[in-house]
Swiss-Prot record:
Lineage start: Eukaryota, Metamonada, Parabasalia, Tritrichomonadida, Tritrichomonadidae
Additional note from the record: Binds to bacitracin.
Protein name: 28 kDa protein
Native species: Tritrichomonas foetus
Length: 29
């Protein structure tokens, strides 16, 4: 995801194309 928005309590990250990529919290640590 180029533009990652991490929602609290969620592992879903939306990229610029409006598609959803599933990541774990640890990906951002």
């Amino acid at each position: 995801a180029r533009y990652a928005i991490l929602f609290a309590g969620s592992n879903v990250v939306y990229n610029a194309x409006x598609q959803a990529d599933i990541y774990t919290i640890y990906t951002f640590l």
